[in-house]
Amino acid sequence: MNKKSIRDVDLKGKRVFCRVDFNVPMKDGKITDETRIRAALPTIQYLVEQGAKVILASHLGRPKGQVVEEMRLTPVAVRLGELLGKDVKKADEAFGPAVQEMVAAMNEGDILVLENVRFYAGEEKNDAELAKEFAALADIFVNDAFGAAHRAHASTAGIADYLPAVAGFLMEKELEVLGKALSNPDRPFTAIIGGAKVKDKIGVIRHLLDKVDNLIIGGGLAYTFVKALGHEIGLSLCEDDKIELAKEFMALAKEKGVNFYMPVDVVITEEFSETATTKIVDIDSIPSNWEGVDIGPKTREIYADVIKNSKLVVWNGPMGVFEMTPFSNGTRAVGQALADAEGTYSVIGGGDSAAAVEKFGMADKMSHISTGGGASLEFMEGKELPGVVCLNDK
């Protein structure tokens, strides 16, 4: 990684504005999944050990520039204190005189959690005045919120105009793992692209066709490719305006010597429910009033075999509607193949794929689970991320 990290700067006695991703799911004021809080702990602990005054900033939910009581970060600050076993103070605002007083009273190793930065309309507009207010609280900016790195916001990018800016450990690991996958991958390198829509994955497919040895397609977006080959797909999801693009991608793969894998059989249903009747049919035999909802057993075997023989696998997007049990076997099978593959480095691209390996209890068998769905997707598209570009070079 060619960006400075917290290892490269002197932190003792410094006020550090650390942007973290504490955007955790909440229900009735309780945190239902604290993965993101735990992911930030190594950076926070390091800052504390180095004698910094640690000021933590995050968003939670989408309050759209106004105060929404149930989106306050108070429960997060409480839980953070429990996890660290130390006192964590919480401000009622994210800047201003009251916050400045709290910062002035901090000792080395103290932690202060600011209020939800998205309570202020200037945050998502990357407003320079708000960025200056944030910067006024600190001596150094640390970005450890990879999940928000694709956003040019006041607390993720704008603040870096006014302070030295470095990466936290979580950000550093994401950039190293994803960066190596794209610039210097171990081979064979396989990308598994699933999810519902082709339009969401156009950029990533196009960018990866130049880099991978194998491209595996699954999920709802597969049916646009199936239709592009001239097969009937019944009521399956399809983007007719993307059929020509699908043809172009398949031709490009051939031209570049990329093995392009598509479902050979699928699970079909007439209704979306937990108790749905399903059938397995070959890809060219989907009846007109049925819909494809998962990859079939023959496809699972082929995909598992490709995975097993790969050195690096990047997975972005499920193989079917994994939230419903009858349609979850394809996604589970891909997860299982990754869990069982020896000598294969697996990178799970955040979002639904991360939720799936979590749901199936396979998370600890994956080499790297990205903490950013949208951010990892944009990184995989070869885009520059504002929250990364703004960091100081080594």
From Swiss-Prot:
Any idea which residues bear Phosphothreonine here? T299
InterPro entries named in the record: Phosphoglycerate_kinase, Phosphoglycerate_kinase_CS, Phosphoglycerate_kinase_N, Phosphoglycerate_kinase_sf
- Alphabetically ordered keywords of this record: ATP-binding, Cytoplasm, Glycolysis, Kinase, Nucleotide-binding, Phosphoprotein, Transferase
Q: What is its main location?
A: cytoplasm
List GO BP terms, alphabetically.
gluconeogenesis; glycolytic process
Q: Which residues carry this modification: Phosphoserine?
A: S183
GO molecular function, one example? ATP binding
**Pathway(s) the chain acts in:** Carbohydrate degradation; glycolysis; pyruvate from D-glyceraldehyde 3-phosphate: step 2/5
- Decide whether keyword Manganese is in the record: no
One Gene Ontology cellular component term attached to this UniProt record is: cytosol
Superkingdom, natural source: Bacteria
Write down the chemical reaction(s) this protein catalyses.
Answer: (2R)-3-phosphoglycerate + ATP = (2R)-3-phospho-glyceroyl phosphate + ADP
Give the binding site residues for substrate. D21, F22, N23, R36, H59, L60, G61, R62, R118, R151
- So what EC number does this one have? 2.7.2.3
List locations, semicolon-separated: Cytoplasm
Broad EC category: transferase
Q: Which residues bind ATP?
A: K201, G292, E323, G350, G351, D352, S353
Alphabetical list of HAMAP family matching this protein: Phosphoglyc_kinase
Give the protein family: Belongs to the phosphoglycerate kinase family.
State whether it acts alone or in a complex, and with which partners, per the record. Answer: Monomer.
Q: What is this protein called?
A: Phosphoglycerate kinase
Q: Which organism is it from?
A: Bacillus cytotoxicus (strain DSM 22905 / CIP 110041 / 391-98 / NVH 391-98)
